[in-house]
């Protein structure tokens, strides 16, 4: 982060790659908030965060943060307060940390990423992928309702 700011950037947003509900609108809103706020935080439902927007870097922002815990977002928020920086909070979103999280996300009817859902369902139904990555517990019971998407076996 310090290198990014030293290269002349005056607004930086760090995003996680496991939050499938992050939208371009949220990113746009982040940079709009950074016009008036020093920090923007997008908390995740599991206690982490999916986005951190900054106008300047300070290593103390990450002091005493217990990474991969359920209090990461709260600890960063507390550090922001101790540094007397203004903070905008984004909507809380889910991130994907397990197969169950991915399955639940795929089953949401309100998810707008229909192309991604179709692609992931197709990928999950591929025999090689299922054997390598899908636990046996969910192989047939939960994925069989999507088998209609594939042509019948030859």
Q: What residues fall within each predicted segment?
A:
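Active-site rim beta-loop-alpha module in soluble metabolic enzymes
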Residues: 44, 55, 63
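Conserved donor-nucleotide/metal-binding helix-loop-beta segment in metal-dependent transferases, i.e.
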Residues: 19-47
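Portal/gating segments that form or line small-molecule/metal binding sites
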Residues: 1-2
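Conserved alpha/beta core of the MobA/IspD/sugar-nucleotide pyrophosphorylase nucleotidyltransferase superfamily
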Residues: 78-154
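Short beta-strand-to-loop acidic/aromatic patch adjacent to the donor-nucleotide binding site
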Residues: 9-17
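Short, glycine-/small-residue-rich phosphate/pyrophosphate-handling segment
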Residues: 58-77, 140
């Amino acid at each position: 982060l310090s290198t990014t700011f030293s290269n002349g950037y005056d607004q930086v947003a760090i995003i996680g790659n496991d939050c499938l509900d992050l939208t371009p609108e949220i990113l746009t809103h982040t940079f709009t908030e950074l016009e008036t706020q020093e920090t923007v935080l997008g908390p995740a439902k599991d206690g982490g965060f999916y986005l951190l927007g900054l106008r300047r870097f300070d290593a103390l922002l990450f002091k005493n943060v217990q990474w991969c815990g359920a209090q990461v977002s709260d600890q960063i928020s507390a550090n922001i307060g101790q540094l007397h920086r203004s903070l905008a909070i984004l909507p809380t979103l889910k991130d994907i940390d397990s197969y169950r999280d991915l399955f639940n996300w795929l089953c949401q009817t309100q998810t707008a990423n229909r192309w991604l859902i179709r692609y992931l369902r197709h990928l999950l139904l591929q025999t090689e992928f299922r054997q390598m990555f899908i636990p046996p517990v969910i192989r047939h019971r939960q994925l069989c309702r999507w088998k209609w998407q594939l042509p019948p076996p030859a």
